[in-house]
C-alpha cells in the first residue's frame, strides 16, 4: 500500500473529488481526516471508511477552525504527513457582475483557505521530518475563460502560492505541489461538458474521480519524494 502509516487531512472531502480521494487514501493504508463545510456530508464519508477516518465540520477560511483540525488530528492520529487543499468555491460571474463581497469570499476560500492550511500543518510536518501539501487548482488557472473572473483569479493565485511555498518550505522537507483537474465525473460536472467531451477533450471522455485520486495518492506517497514546486494537469490533454 502506497500510503501505509501516513496521516492525511483532506478538505472539501464530503463529496465529489475530495470524497473519492479520502476513500482511495484509506484503501492505500492512510488514516484520513475528512473536513467539509457540510458536516453531515463529511461524517457520511468517514462512516463509510470506518475506523481509519474521522470527520470534522470545517470552513477553510476560518483560522480558528484550522487550529481545531490540526489539534484533533494530532490528538487522534499523532502526526500529519499530508494535506490536500481540495476545498474550493466555484461560481460563474463576469468582471462587471463581480462585486467586492463576492471577490473576497472567493479569495477567502480558494486562496486564504489553502494558505491557512499550509500555515497550520507546517509546524507538525516539520516536527515529523517533512510532509506533502497538495493544492488543487483548476484548468482556469492555465487559461482564461470569460465569465469566471473571480474564480479564475483565485486559482491563478493557488499556482503562485504553491511555487513560493515549495521554495520556503523545502528546507523543512515539506513538498508543495499543484494538481489541476480537467473535466472530472462528479455531481458538480456541467452536463454540457460531459455531453461534448468527444469534441472538447482529445481523449474523448471526461476523467473519473478515481483517476484523479490516484494522482493525488502518487504525489502524497514516498514515490514522489523529490517532486516539489511542480504542476500537473490531469485533463486528458484538454489544455496543453
Enumerate the predicted regions with their spans.
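Substrate-binding pocket helix/loop in short-chain dehydrogenase/reductase
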Residues: 94-95, 99-107, 197
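Residue(s) in the substrate-gating loop at a strand-loop-helix junction
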Residues: 138
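C-terminal substrate-recognition "lid" of short-chain dehydrogenase/reductases
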Residues: 2, 115-118, 208-234, 238-239
Amino acid at each position: 500500500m502506497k500510503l501505509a502509516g501516513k496521516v492525511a487531512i483532506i478538505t472539501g472531502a464530503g463529496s465529489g473529488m475530495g470524497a473519492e480521494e479520502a476513500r482511495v487514501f484509506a484503501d492505500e493504508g492512510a488514516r484520513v481526516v475528512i473536513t467539509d463545510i457540510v458536516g453531515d456530508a463529511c461524517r457520511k464519508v468517514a462512516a463509510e471508511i470506518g475506523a481509519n477516518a474521522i470527520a470534522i465540520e470545517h470552513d477553510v477560511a476560518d483560522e480558528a477552525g484550522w487550529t481545531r483540525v490540526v489539534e484533533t488530528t494530532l490528538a487522534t492520529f499523532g502526526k500529519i504527513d499530508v494535506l490536500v487543499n481540495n476545498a474550493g468555491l466555484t461560481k460563474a460571474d463576469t468582471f462587471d457582475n463581480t462585486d467586492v463581497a463576492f471577490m473576497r469570499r472567493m479569495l477567502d476560500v480558494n486562496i486564504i483557505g489553502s494558505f491557512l492550511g499550509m500555515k497550520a500543518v507546517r509546524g507538525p510536518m516539520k516536527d515529523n521530518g517533512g510532509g506533502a501539501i497538495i493544492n488543487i487548482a483548476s484548468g482556469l488557472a492555465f487559461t482564461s475563460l470569460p465569465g469566471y473572473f473571480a474564480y479564475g483569479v483565485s486559482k491563478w493565485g493557488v499556482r503562485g502560492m504553491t511555487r513560493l511555498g515549495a521554495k520556503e518550505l523545502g528546507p523543512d522537507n515539506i513538498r508543495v505541489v499543484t494538481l489541476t483537474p480537467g473535466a472530472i465525473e462528479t455531481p458538480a460536472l456541467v452536463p454540457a461538458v460531459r455531453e461534448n467531451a468527444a469534441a472538447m477533450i482529445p481523449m474523448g471522455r471526461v476523467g473519473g474521480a478515481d483517476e484523479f485520486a490516484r494522482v493525488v495518492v502518487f504525489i502524497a506517497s514516498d514515490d514522489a519524494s523529490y517532486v516539489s514546486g511542480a504542476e500537473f494537469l490531469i485533463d486528458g490533454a484538454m489544455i496543453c
